[in-house]
Each structure stands twice: as C-alpha cells, then as structure tokens.
C-alpha cells in the first residue's frame, strides 16, 4: 500500500514539474516584454554617481533621483 501511494505521489509530482495540471495542457505564455536583470545600483539609488543613475534611466527605464 505504501508503495502505491509513493508511486502515485511521484507520478503526480513529475506531471506538475512538467507543467501539466488537471488533464488539460497548454503552453506557458511568454512574457510580453523581455525580462532584464537590473544592476543593484538601479534599485538602490542613494549614493550612486549621477552617471550611473543616467545610465540606469536610459538603459532600463528606471530613473533614479539622487537624494
């Protein structure tokens, strides 16, 4: 009995990992825009040089206001 429960659990876990759910499968949607990994300086704007803030604003659309 334990073996059956273990096998069912492993099979369901494998299906979830592959992206299947409740018998109906569909492709995962792609993001509408590319995902960029931002440098830490863009998120923490305090104490960064103004050239770095300008670069962040130009490249990632993340305008930093120094303060």
Swiss-Prot record:
GO biological process: defense response to bacterium; defense response to fungus; killing of cells of another organism
UniProt xrefs under Pfam families: Penaeidin
Cellular localisation: Cytoplasmic granule
Domain of life from the UniProt record: Eukaryota
UniProt keywords, alphabetically: Amidation, Antibiotic, Antimicrobial, Chitin-binding, Disulfide bond, Fungicide, Signal
Arginine amide: residues carrying this PTM: 66
Signal sequence annotation: 1-19
Gene Ontology MF, one: chitin binding
Nucleus keyword on record: no
InterPro entries: Penaeidin
Paired cysteines (S-S): 42-56, 45-63, 57-64
Regions annotated as coiled coil: none
GO CC annotation terms, alphabetical: cytoplasm
Stated family: Belongs to the penaeidin family.
Protein function: Antibacterial and antifungal activity. Presents chitin-binding activity.
Protein's name according to its UniProt entry: Penaeidin-4c
């Amino acid at each position: 009995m334990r073996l059956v429960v273990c096998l069912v659990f492993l099979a369901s876990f494998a299906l979830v990992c592959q992206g299947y759910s409740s018998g109906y499968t569909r492709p995962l949607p792609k993001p509408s825009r590319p995902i960029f990994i931002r440098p830490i300086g863009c998120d923490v704007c305090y104490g960064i040089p103004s050239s770095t803030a300008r670069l962040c604003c130009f490249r990632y659309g993340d305008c930093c206001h120094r303060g």
